[in-house]
Amino acid sequence: MLGPPVNLPKWLEENSHLLKPPINNYCVYNDDFTVMIVGGPNARTDYHINQTPEWFYQYKGAMMLKVVDDGVFRDIIIREGDMFLLPGNTPHNPVRFADTVGVVLEQRRPEGSIDRMRWYCQNPDCTPGQVVHEASFHCTDLGTQIKAGVESFKTDESLRKCGKCGELADWCPKPGSILDPNKA
């Protein structure tokens, strides 16, 4: 049986307490497509890589999508009312700021597909794009698996140490290290 439509403003009024760090997401639908409502702020430094595209719609405020595009690190600002389709296999780190809300749509992962969470060395003197740690898994529950990966990286310093320069990678962005486009 089909469920009723979701009224986003009403849902947020009644359920915004469900958007908890470090990911701040809640899966509204989780069938052939996963539809997540995502609030800010979040606190993560990983770059997620999945084999299927992701669709972003920014309902309130602006977000920053940090990506690695053909080996180049760059930031894409998705403003209130904007939508953006991220191709599969693109390393990305969604940065959400306080009092912002977006909707993200992802395909159910095909059998045998592998998601990855990758952390890069943040030391400017190290090799650009140096991977500190990468976790791989078949994603069946976006609501819990990404959060578990972030928590694992946070609590295990051995995962955070760069094998090339020895720098300890941050598990969350340092305060003030990312400029909020909502305040520009």
Swiss-Prot record:
Record key words, sorted: Cytoplasm, Dioxygenase, Iron, Metal-binding, Oxidoreductase, Pyridine nucleotide biosynthesis
Pfam families: 3-HAO
Binding site for a divalent metal cation: C121, C126, C162, C165
Compartments, record wording: Cytoplasm
Pathway connected to this protein: Cofactor biosynthesis; NAD(+) biosynthesis; quinolinate from L-kynurenine: step 3/3
Catalytically driven reaction(s): 3-hydroxyanthranilate + O2 = (2Z,4Z)-2-amino-3-carboxymuconate 6-semialdehyde
Spans traversing the lipid bilayer: none
Any single Gene Ontology cellular-component annotation: cytoplasm
Binding annotation for Fe cation: H48, E54, H92
Cofactor(s), names only, from the UniProt record: Fe(2+)
Protein's UniProt keywords contain Disulfide bond: no
Function summary: Catalyzes the oxidative ring opening of 3-hydroxyanthranilate to 2-amino-3-carboxymuconate semialdehyde, which spontaneously cyclizes to quinolinate.
Entry-linked PANTHER family: 3-HYDROXYANTHRANILATE 3,4-DIOXYGENASE
Family label: Belongs to the 3-HAO family.
Protein name in UniProt: 3-hydroxyanthranilate 3,4-dioxygenase
The species this protein was found in: Pyricularia oryzae (strain 70-15 / ATCC MYA-4617 / FGSC 8958)
